[in-house]
């Protein structure tokens, strides 16, 4: 797993004023439209300032509004991916890959996305606009926050697909009857052409 993702994580060191150094695992975040440009880091394992447990979050100055960890063991470009796997953390994505790679050889070609724990419309739109034909796999944690993130992503997937459909005079009444964020089958069936 480390070899599969070796380009997609690093160790980050923060030098403190007292001479102490904090080292953590860092996952570079990029913009979906420009995956070569690093716009921040998702961090895991840094000591908290209050001395309690370890910290998981974003490095100071990270573009958390648009940036995501975007990784593919086979270096599959986002726009060419057939499978997109969405996670709340890069660490979870790598663990998923490690658990399932033997049974699913296609995972090497998949693109793994980490939102860093939060999910914004710009993050979702940035990925979905490039990956409409790809299968989107929602892999957030099975807790309340994960459920909220999954529902938000599901609604954005529906919106993106809906916006990609050509609106013809015959289709317009039905398409207009679909509630915002609902699947294509959410409209009034009697309005179908």
Tell me the role of every PLM-derived stretch:
Residues 1-63:
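Basic, glycine-enriched DNA-binding surface that flanks or lies within the catalytic cores of DNA
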Residues 32, 92, 143-144:
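Short, glycine-/Ser/Thr-/acidic-enriched flexible segments
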Residues 98-193:
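TOPRIM fold recognition
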Residues 88-89:
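Helix N-cap/beta->alpha junction signal
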Residues 21-27, 65-67, 82-83, 93:
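Short glycine-rich loop/turn motifs
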Residues 32-37, 77-79, 103-107:
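Short, solvent-exposed loop/turn segments that connect beta-strands within catalytic domains
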Residues 53-81:
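Glycine-/acidic-rich phosphate or pyrophosphate-binding loops and their flanking alpha/beta elements
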Residues 80-84, 135-136:
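Short active-site oxyanion
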